[in-house]
């Protein structure tokens, strides 16, 4: 019934309703599409609505050299744009159709392959490589990002196709370690990736992010936990990763490096269990004029403050720095506790009192 409507009526109906899908009921879909006033391309509409049957029909029209394909119903730029988007989403059938319609798989430095790899779409990766995509393009982006996101099957496939696991100073294994992808890390090590690249970045960032099994594995492979002034144990402490801290200490990490930075920063961030463990292992809570309690007070970590006081820290150090910072930042319970154990609210010309009044007002 709809097929017998004149083109001008179709245009009016679609322009009024905004429903381009109505055109799909007409065999002259593409001709009508070019007549409506809605600002949208054929490819954009078809791809975004996952109309694979329409894409296949377009491929057929191209193969038989139908005159409609000579008209500007799609451009190479738009084909490339949606090839990249579809590759990122893992839409293999759409990717195949777009390539058949003339999309360039190597556009934007093989961006389609890079994004398909990054997001773990193995079938799309295999298809694009089969069509000539370069696995080493853009500084081996594909394998680096597949490793970063833990897509082991994609990593293995890219390696089989010649990807360089050592690119960008072994960035693949560094990022895999940072993000906790043990299987990828082990695989890359089996291919002789350098775990000590960039001043032992891999073990430092695995520690920082709390990936204990990766830390243990890297240490077993010869990683240096003492690199960069014991960065590993410092940042594991800062982020509250107690089990990682314990393991690193068992491997002779120096918890007092950089003037006891580990316990100071763990106190600052409120990681009570880490603070307790570090103190039991010999960390000094009194360094830098009892900086640890000042930082804990500033950030309102009452339980840490109580623990530090129990361990003999000086709450009146630096002219009652702790209560002044607690007052300045509005941590009433910390202020009350510090007062109860002898902090002087009148220190520094009644600084704490004045800050409390300001916050109340």
Swiss-Prot record:
ANK repeats lie at residues 77-107, 108-137, 138-167, 169-197, 198-227, 229-257, 258-287, 289-317, 318-347. Keywords: ANK repeat, Repeat. The keyword Lyase does not apply. It holds the Pfam family Ank_2. InterPro entries: Ankyrin_rpt, Ankyrin_rpt-contain_sf. It comes from the Viruses. Coiled coil: none annotated. This is Putative ankyrin repeat protein R901. The lineage of its organism: Viruses, Varidnaviria, Bamfordvirae, Nucleocytoviricota, Megaviricetes.
């Amino acid at each position: 019934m709809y097929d017998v409507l004149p083109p001008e009526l179709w245009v009016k109906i679609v322009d009024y309703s905004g429903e381009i899908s109505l055109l799909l009921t007409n065999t002259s879909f593409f001709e009508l599409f070019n007549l409506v006033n809605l600002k949208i391309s054929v490819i954009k509409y078809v791809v975004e609505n996952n109309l694979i049957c329409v894409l296949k029909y377009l491929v057929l029209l191209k193969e038989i050299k139908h005159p409609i394909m000579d008209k500007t119903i799609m451009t190479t730029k738009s084909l490339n744009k949606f090839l990249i988007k579809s590759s990122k989403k893992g839409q293999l059938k759409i990717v195949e159709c777009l390539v058949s319609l003339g999309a360039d798989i190597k556009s934007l430095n093989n961006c389609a392959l890079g994004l398909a790899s990054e997001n773990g779409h193995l079938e799309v990766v295999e298809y694009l490589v089969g069509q000539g995509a370069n696995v080493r393009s853009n500084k081996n982006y594909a394998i680096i990002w597949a490793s970063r996101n833990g897509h082991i099957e994609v990593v293995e496939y890219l390696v089989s196709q010649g990807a360089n696991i050592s690119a960008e100073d072994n960035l693949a294994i560094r990022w895999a370690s940072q993000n906790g992808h043990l299987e990828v890390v082990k695989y890359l090590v089996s291919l002789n990736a350098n775990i000590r690249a960039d001043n032992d970045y891999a073990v430092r960032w695995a520690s920082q992010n709390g990936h204990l099994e990766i830390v243990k594995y890297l240490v077993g492979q010869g990683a240096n936990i003492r690199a960069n002034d014991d960065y590993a144990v410092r940042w594991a402490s800062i982020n509250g990763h107690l089990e990682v801290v314990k393991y690193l200490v068992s491997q002779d990490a120096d918890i007092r490096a950089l003037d006891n930075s580990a316990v100071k920063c763990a106190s600052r961030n409120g990681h009570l269990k880490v603070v307790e463990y570090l103190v039991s292992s010999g960390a000094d809570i009194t360094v830098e004029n009892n900086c640890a309690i000042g930082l804990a007070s500033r950030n309102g970590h009452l339980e840490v403050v109580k623990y530090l006081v129990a361990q003999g820290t000086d709450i009146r150090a630096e002219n009652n720095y702790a209560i002044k910072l607690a007052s300045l930042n509005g941590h009433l319970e910390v202020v009350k506790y510090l007062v109860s154990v002898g902090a002087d609210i009148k220190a520094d010309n009644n600084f704490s009192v004045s800050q409390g009044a300001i916050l109340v007002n």
